[in-house]
Each structure stands twice: as C-alpha cells, then as structure tokens.
Amino acid sequence: MATNPTMLTGLSGNVSIPRMTSTSTAYFVGESGSPTESQQAFDQVNMTPKTVGAFVDYSRRLLLQSSIDVESMIRDDIAKVIATKLDNAAIYGSGSSNEPLGIKDTTGVGTQSISTFGTFAEYIGMETDVAAANADVANMFYLINASARGALKSTEKASNTAQFVFENNEINGYPAIVSNQLANNDVLFGDFSQFVIGMWSGLDLTVDPYANATAGSVIILALQDVDFAVKQPGAFCFGT
C-alpha cells in the first residue's frame, strides 16, 4: 500500500503491541494544592503470522518453445499476485479462515453511507468522523478506485460552481490514492500510520524441479507470513 503504514519486519513468534485506551487527567489546583492522581489505561493489539502463498508448475516443453525467461516471468507474476492479495486483505480481510483482519471489519472503525461514488458532503462526513477521534491530520489519505476518481472529476462540490470533488489528486485537500482493490462505491479515509503491517518473512520463493520430474515439469512456490493490526480504529472511516 502506498499510504505510509507502520511496517514491522523480521518478526518472530506472536507479537503484542501496547495501545493506550485512555489518557491521564490534568487539573487546576489552588496554591499548595496537589492534583488528583490519574492513570492511563492500556490494552494490546495482538498479531500472529498468517501465510499467503501461490504456486505454479510449468512444463519442459514450455521452456523449450519459449524465447523468453519463463521462470523469471512466472516469479514476477507470483510476486505481483501475492502483493495484490495482501493489498485486498489489508482492506477487506475477514480475520477468519487463515486470513488477516482488514481495516473494514475492525471493531471501532467509523462508517459513512455513500451514494453512488459519493457527494462532497459525504466525504466531509468521513473527515469529521476521523477528526473527532483525534487522528493525525498529516497522515490522512483517501483510498478510492479508478471508477470513483473518474466520476468525482466531474462531480461538483455544489451546483454550478465548476469546483469538483476530485482535483489535483486530492479530495477536499487530502491526498486521494487510487487503488482498484476498493470495490465500486467503497471509500476508505484515515490516518494510515495507525495501520500496522507485520512481516515474519520476506517473499520465500522455492523452485522445485524434482517433485514432478517424471512429467518434466517444474514447480515454483511462493510463501509469505504476514498479519495486520489497527492501533487506533477511530483513525479510519469506511464509506460504502
């Protein structure tokens, strides 16, 4: 994702990230008075490795007939497929069936009803929802898909103003990043520094010429161990 998430690499075992759920309290006091004691409260965001993988096998005949580097082409394709799968899971992951939990279904993430590709007022509603959670304005982005971008380029903020919702790669002053991982009529807005990507490994690629040697085919297997977490769910709003 091109939204500057927090990256944790080289992890081992399960990981717990401390999260402050309430702050201490300040008081005005009289001369020689003492403020009342207060304490922060903490909980933890837990991350456990989830494995995403893909494999293909290709024949000896394909190697003989092709003038290109087939193995390199297949490796590149597998890497792109896994990256695309991870991008989708970061947004829509169910948290079940060995899949990480994505932003959309994380408890505490704000929601906003979106009509078709959204009105200017609906986008302002998303911004207000996130700002009320004291998210970091400097790290806020919109994620929209290419169809939404096209529609919003001709959607006026108000009638007969010639001012459009999407201008200069921004929506209302916030960067708008286009990702076709977003379904039509879905919009994600928030402080993406609060989204954590944990990686227990790089992309592990294995070339196996032996398993199907009698058939003359070669297997390429790719595996990667990752998990996602949202440190401050209120820093996001999902529109749909």
Language-model segment annotations:
Residues L11, S16, S94-D227, Q232-A235:
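Extended oligomerization regions of viral-like shell subunits
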